[in-house]
Amino acid sequence: MSSELMFNYTFSWPAGPKDVILTGTFDDWRGTLPLVKTAKGNFEITMPVKLANKDDTFQFKFIVDGVWCVSDSYKKEHVSEGIENNFLQITDLVETQEVAGASRIPEAGGLLCGKPPRSAGPPSTSNRKKNKRNNKKRRSKLKKKSTKNNKKSNESLDDNEEEDGVTGTTTEDVTGTSREETPLAEPTNVSKEAPGNFHILPIDQSADTTQSNGIIGGPGPVLVPNPGEIKEFTEIRDVDARELNERLNKKEEVPEPVAGPIVESSVTEKSPALPQADDLIVETKEMAHNVQELTPQVEAVTPLINEPEPLPTPEAQISIPESSKVEPVEGSLQPKLVEKRESTEGVSDGSKKVENKAKKDEEVFTLDPIVNKAPKLPLTDEQTAEGRKSPAVSEEKEKKKKQEKGSKEVKRSETSKEKKPSAKEVKKQTVKAPKKQTASPLSSSTEEPKKKKTGFFGKLKKLFK
């Protein structure tokens, strides 16, 4: 174990200077430990002092407002070259020791830091609980024996109760174990114990502007040096709430200059032109005269309205030109109807041709009796004459039909360019195509094949196809 001795010692300096710093061998004379200014105005600090042995000394010095000084309240020691320092011995440190377990904090201005005093509490009841448990065990044993002999059990119970009264301990005889009865430990020499080392924080020596206010119990009320110059201390306002609200409401209720002044200006401009009450009667008379004057004109017009309109003459009907707007409408509507008819006719003719070919190629055999058909009669001269008309008439009809076909084809090309059939319309056209009728053997035998037309009308139909 180390033979170093450690003591807590309080260094002080009287009131007067602004800043006091303690320095010595503990910080190699660097001046790193400032003293704390107390409420009285003096400077103090408590710190641990280490001594290597009993004969060793603790040398220190004070720096007061930047000047190295020596205090007269401590022992002085002259060093070589005329330097003087304060010092402490072991005897000085032992005299200042206080109760063990309490120490002072240097950073808190020498405040004590120790164990709190013991607080008194209720007496312990552990002894009572132990006695109750022992008595219960004894009684349970005695009850078991009473089953064998009731008389003996009763006597034994009385004896045991008497023994309990003599040997049992009460709470009064039990030694107190509360904190109140435990004595405090006697103070021992702190020199024998070696408490832990204290960590001393460095401080800047150039901080001369710092001021410490010695106020007991923390900061208090602030006293301003010039209270007369502050407005808050002198101005007092007595404001009536109703008057203030009325004044503010009047300021807020401002008319909106949007539509009001425009209407008023127009009215004011026309207002001088308005007549008074006497002039109004005159105006009503004038209005009545004006109405009477206008009535014959209305009567003159009424017979014209009641007269029947003249019917248009045939000359007028001829002279009326046809409207040019009707022609494009007819041209646009007709091709649509023609297209639908041609689509159905073409499909139906194709289906009929296919059916006729199938009927000719296939030989249908049925169980029905064979019927002899009547032979075709030769055509007469009158019928041939009707079929052979004049070639001039037929040529004129063919030219007209060709012209009509050309006009229809031109209209179709125009409409097809304007409107192309959509996918839905194409589907509808395909759906509208008639289904091929499958001829059953029974029905085909009964139906007769259609005769081919070789006359003039048949040739015309072929041309249209």
Swiss-Prot record:
<feature type="region of interest" description="Disordered">
    <location>
        <begin position="298"/>
        <end position="465"/>
    </location>
</feature>
<dbReference type="GO" id="GO:0005737">
    <property type="term" value="C:cytoplasm"/>
</dbReference>
<comment type="similarity">
    <text>Belongs to the CRP1/MDG1 family.</text>
</comment>
<dbReference type="GO" id="GO:0007165">
    <property type="term" value="P:signal transduction"/>
</dbReference>
<dbReference type="GO" id="GO:0003677">
    <property type="term" value="F:DNA binding"/>
</dbReference>
<feature type="compositionally biased region" description="Basic and acidic residues">
    <location>
        <begin position="404"/>
        <end position="428"/>
    </location>
</feature>
<protein>
    <recommendedName>
        <fullName>Cruciform DNA-recognizing protein 1</fullName>
    </recommendedName>
</protein>
<feature type="modified residue" description="Phosphoserine">
    <location>
        <position position="153"/>
    </location>
</feature>
<feature type="modified residue" description="Phosphoserine">
    <location>
        <position position="394"/>
    </location>
</feature>
<keyword id="KW-0238">DNA-binding</keyword>
<dbReference type="InterPro" id="IPR014756">
    <property type="entry name" value="Ig_E-set"/>
</dbReference>
<feature type="modified residue" description="Phosphoserine">
    <location>
        <position position="156"/>
    </location>
</feature>
<feature type="region of interest" description="Disordered">
    <location>
        <begin position="107"/>
        <end position="227"/>
    </location>
</feature>
<comment type="function">
    <text>Cruciform DNA-binding protein which exerts an enhancing effect on the cleavage of cruciform DNA (X-DNA) by endonuclease VII from bacteriophage T4.</text>
</comment>
<dbReference type="Pfam" id="PF16561">
    <property type="entry name" value="AMPK1_CBM"/>
</dbReference>
<feature type="compositionally biased region" description="Acidic residues">
    <location>
        <begin position="156"/>
        <end position="165"/>
    </location>
</feature>
<dbReference type="InterPro" id="IPR050827">
    <property type="entry name" value="CRP1_MDG1_kinase"/>
</dbReference>
<dbReference type="GO" id="GO:0019901">
    <property type="term" value="F:protein kinase binding"/>
</dbReference>
<feature type="compositionally biased region" description="Basic residues">
    <location>
        <begin position="451"/>
        <end position="465"/>
    </location>
</feature>
<feature type="region of interest" description="Disordered">
    <location>
        <begin position="247"/>
        <end position="274"/>
    </location>
</feature>
<feature type="modified residue" description="Phosphoserine">
    <location>
        <position position="271"/>
    </location>
</feature>
<feature type="modified residue" description="Phosphothreonine">
    <location>
        <position position="295"/>
    </location>
</feature>
<feature type="compositionally biased region" description="Basic residues">
    <location>
        <begin position="127"/>
        <end position="151"/>
    </location>
</feature>
<feature type="region of interest" description="X-DNA-binding">
    <location>
        <begin position="160"/>
        <end position="161"/>
    </location>
</feature>
<feature type="modified residue" description="Phosphoserine">
    <location>
        <position position="343"/>
    </location>
</feature>
<feature type="compositionally biased region" description="Basic and acidic residues">
    <location>
        <begin position="337"/>
        <end position="363"/>
    </location>
</feature>
<feature type="modified residue" description="Phosphoserine">
    <location>
        <position position="319"/>
    </location>
</feature>
<feature type="compositionally biased region" description="Low complexity">
    <location>
        <begin position="166"/>
        <end position="177"/>
    </location>
</feature>
<feature type="modified residue" description="Phosphothreonine">
    <location>
        <position position="182"/>
    </location>
</feature>
<keyword id="KW-0597">Phosphoprotein</keyword>
<feature type="modified residue" description="Phosphoserine">
    <location>
        <position position="440"/>
    </location>
</feature>
<feature type="compositionally biased region" description="Basic and acidic residues">
    <location>
        <begin position="385"/>
        <end position="398"/>
    </location>
</feature>
<dbReference type="InterPro" id="IPR013783">
    <property type="entry name" value="Ig-like_fold"/>
</dbReference>
<dbReference type="GO" id="GO:0005634">
    <property type="term" value="C:nucleus"/>
</dbReference>
<feature type="modified residue" description="Phosphothreonine">
    <location>
        <position position="366"/>
    </location>
</feature>
<dbReference type="GO" id="GO:0031588">
    <property type="term" value="C:nucleotide-activated protein kinase complex"/>
</dbReference>
<dbReference type="InterPro" id="IPR032640">
    <property type="entry name" value="AMPK1_CBM"/>
</dbReference>
